[in-house]
């Protein structure tokens, strides 16, 4: 449990891991069980992110991206995540600052630095990392649009995965094998979440 009345759950993983599908199915299940549930995602306020990309694209690097997402995250926490938690909701967030740690570190920023600039962000009660081989994730998403095509190259995604595995090893999140069929992955996630929900 967090210092609030609710429960803050984060789902992490590369695109194609099944985060959003898992989040929606889990939300529906928890609502049926009588919980108040709110789904959200990051990046949150794309006006910040998109404006920076357009105006300062030639200056962009891992450090500028990480700081942009950190500012975006602060708005997200203050305007959406915390208000729902204070009302006793389970908040399911599709990506959080661990995405910045994994992706911006793969771009070249030290992973410890990315974690440092996010150290005062609200800590999740539980973070589940859906681990999928990038080749499988890319195959699952074939033909789908992406907001951030620069993050979809296979060699880059393997670096991202290594960063996620580092975060798992350091105890920041719980790993679920997402290479399997959807129902098996979902059942594991549901079981872990129910074990952590103590109201």
Curated annotation (Swiss-Prot):
Which GO BP terms, alphabetically?
A: dTDP biosynthetic process; dTTP biosynthetic process; dUDP biosynthetic process
Keyword Amino-acid biosynthesis found:
no
Q: Which UniProt keywords are present, listed alphabetically?
A: ATP-binding, Kinase, Nucleotide biosynthesis, Nucleotide-binding, Transferase
Cited InterPro entries = P-loop_NTPase, Thymidylate_kin-like_dom, Thymidylate_kin_CS, Thymidylate_kinase
> Which HAMAP family does its entry note?
Thymidylate_kinase (MF_00165)
A Pfam family of the record is Thymidylate_kin
Family, per entry:
Belongs to the thymidylate kinase family.
Record carries keyword NADP: no
Q: Which reaction does it catalyse?
A: dTMP + ATP = dTDP + ADP
Cite the EC number: 2.7.4.9
Q: Which top EC class is named for this enzyme in its record? A: transferase
Q: Which GO terms label this protein's molecular function in UniProt? A: ATP binding; dTMP kinase activity
GO CC terms on record?
Answer: cytoplasm
Q: Which organism is it from?
A: Staphylothermus marinus (strain ATCC 43588 / DSM 3639 / JCM 9404 / F1)
The name this protein carries in UniProt is Probable thymidylate kinase
Question: Which SUPFAM superfamilies does the entry link to?
Answer: P-loop containing nucleoside triphosphate hydrolases
Can you tell me which residues bind ATP? Answer: 13-20
- Coiled-coil positions are none
Q: Which domain of life is it from?
A: Archaea
């Amino acid at each position: 449990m967090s210092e609030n009345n609710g429960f803050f759950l984060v789902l992490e993983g590369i695109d194609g891991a099944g985060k959003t599908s898992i989040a929606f199915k889990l939300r529906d299940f928890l609502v049926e069980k009588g919980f108040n549930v709110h789904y959200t995602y990051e990046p949150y306020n794309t006006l910040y992110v998109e404006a920076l990309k357009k105006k300062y694209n030639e200056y962009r690097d891992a450090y500028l991206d990480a700081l942009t997402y950190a500012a975006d995250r602060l708005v997200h926490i203050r305007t959406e995540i915390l208000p729902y938690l204070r009302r006793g909701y389970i908040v399911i967030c599709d990506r959080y600052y661990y995405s910045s740690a994994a992706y911006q570190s793969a771009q070249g920023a030290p992973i410890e630095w990315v974690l440092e600039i996010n150290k005062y962000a609200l800590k999740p009660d539980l973070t589940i990392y859906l681990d999928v081989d990038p080749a499988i994730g890319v195959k699952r998403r074939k033909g789908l649009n992406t907001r951030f095509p620069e993050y979809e190259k296979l060699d880059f995604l393997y670096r991202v995965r290594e960063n996620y595995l580092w975060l798992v090893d350091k105890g920041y999140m719980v790993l679920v094998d997402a290479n399997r069929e959807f129902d098996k992955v979902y059942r594991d996630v549901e079981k872990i979440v129910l074990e952590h929900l103590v109201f």
